[in-house]
A protein has these predicted regions:
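Carbohydrate transferase catalytic cores enriched for Leloir-type hexosyltransferases
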Residues: 1-75, 79-83, 90-440
């Protein structure tokens, strides 16, 4: 019996490609992790997760420590996709039985995708389609732009942003080539496209060509972790000490790359630091492509000794870093969503971000907005973020309200509507929330 044969009314079998999630996930990787966690808690979906070799441990947690087996068997000839028997066996394996009466189906995990990106992309076009045929799923989801050219089942693809098309100068040339082609393929072949914001959906509609149904599904917030209150007294101080961070500080959280405008933040901080001798700047995140400019500017700062580089921040430490910041500055020129900005306001922390961006669309009155590219305006916004006046209290209240309206459970529900649409369900099983037709 394949996953499409599971005899449970209302249950849909969905394949999710998690092979692009790195060991240290940020951005789209965080989205994929949180989405799968939320989907795995639902009783109306049977998940098949494809991951890289050696990455099984991370995804087994979705099934409470024991996902269905997905290795070997007849699928080895198809890049280790696993046979139909493996898929069926996983449906009621460790972690859960059939999805009836509020129970759930344990995810099936296949960990045979190659580690290297070039061979993994080949596997996606050859091994994955063969595995999908054997697994018998109803829908396949590519959460990071890509899908098989000849996908044997209806496909849903997530498009995070259009910077590979509109601003190729912000990315490595090879990534531009790959993701431009992936976005074009998703337009032509995907039954449904998930956009993480209206901002991205509008741009996708204007890129031309055929396009399937668009579902606008925003990211969520883990409110158990991202909140104004510490989990226990002194917990945040311990996390900051491990990172080598002292208060007060302005925080940037994200990959350090050209479109994040970290260079502007460094220059703005140098102006403000003259007036605030105790204030530091924390750059939390790994260097990405094109980070040399940041290093050069950092070396030229008068107050460079007050800039702390933490590198990648482990997931458990992120809420403390956001919560204890004097302000979070997210001056990105363009994003598809801007999850750190949303998590910052969920923690009640003042936010400075870019006007005319998805972050402004997302948080609105909860942030101090600045025009992109203006160092002096950014410095002024940092000064404003330090004032405890009525406007600051209004922004904080607005931020907490915005954050409360975003949950990963709602994100999962929006994806379920896209999956059901792609599978051809038209009987009202999907609530249609977050849907948007092209041009609508």
């Amino acid at each position: 019996m394949s996953r499409s044969d599971l005899p449970v009314p209302g249950l849909i079998s969905v394949s999710v490609d998690a092979t692009a999630v790195p060991e240290r996930p940020v951005g789209a990787g965080r989205y994929t992790l949180e989405l799968l966690r939320a989907l795995a808690r639902r009783p109306d979906v049977a998940l098949t997760v494809w991951c890289r070799q050696g990455d099984r441990h991370r995804w087994e947690a979705l099934a409470g420590g024991g996902g269905g087996a997905g290795g070997g068997g007849a699928g080895a000839a198809a890049g280790g996709a696993g046979g139909a028997g493996g898929a069926a066996g996983g449906a009621g394996g460790a972690g859960g039985a059939g999805a009836t009466g509020g129970s759930r189906v344990a995810p099936v995990i296949f960990d045979r995708a190659p580690l290297a990106r070039p061979t993994r992309l080949v596997w996606e076009q050859v091994g994955l389609p063969a595995g999908l045929r054997r697994a018998g799923v109803a829908v396949h989801h590519g959460p990071h732009y890509t899908m098989p050219v000849r996908c044997p089942v209806p496909a849903v693809v997530t498009v995070h942003d259009l910077t590979f098309v509109e601003h190729p100068e912000w990315h490595e040339r090879t990534k531009v080539l790959v993701f431009r082609q992936a976005i074009a393929l998703a337009r032509r072949r995907a039954s449904a496209v998930v956009c993480v914001s209206d901002f991205t959906a509008r741009r996708l509609q204007h890129t031309g060509g055929a396009l399937g149904r668009i579902f606008v599904v925003p990211h969520g917030v883990d409110h158990g972790r991202f909140r104004p209150e510490e989990p226990r007294p002194g917990a945040d101080a311990g996390e900051l000490a491990r990172l080598g961070v002292r208060t007060p500080y302005v925080l940037f959280l994200g990959t350090i790359e050209p479109r994040k405008a970290v260079a502007d933040l460094l220059r703005a901080f140098d102006l403000v630091a003259d007036e605030e001798p105790d204030l530091g700047l924390v750059l939390a995140g790994e260097p990405g492509w094109g980070g040399n400019q940041v290093e050069e500017i950092l070396a030229s700062l008068v107050h460079r000794d007050r800039v702390v580089r933490t590198g990648y921040v482990p997931e458990p430490a992120v809420p403390a870093l956001l919560r204890q910041a004097a302000a979070v500055c997210y001056p990105a020129l363009e994003e598809g969503f801007g999850l750190p900005a949303l998590e910052a306001v969920a923690c009640g922390t003042p936010l400075v971000t870019t006007a005319g961006s998805v972050m402004a669309e997302l948080v609105g009155a909860a942030a101090i907005l600045v025009e992109p590219g203006s160092v002096r305006a950014l410095a002024g916004a940092l000064r404003q973020s330090r004032r405890l006046d009525p406007a600051a209290h209004r922004r904080r209240a607005a931020g907490l309200a915005v954050a409360r309206s975003h949950t990963w459970e709602a994100c999962a529900a929006g994806h379920m509507a896209a999956y059901r649409y792609a599978a051809g369900w038209r009987d009202g099983d999907g609530d249609g929330s977050g849907e948007q037709r092209p041009g609508g």
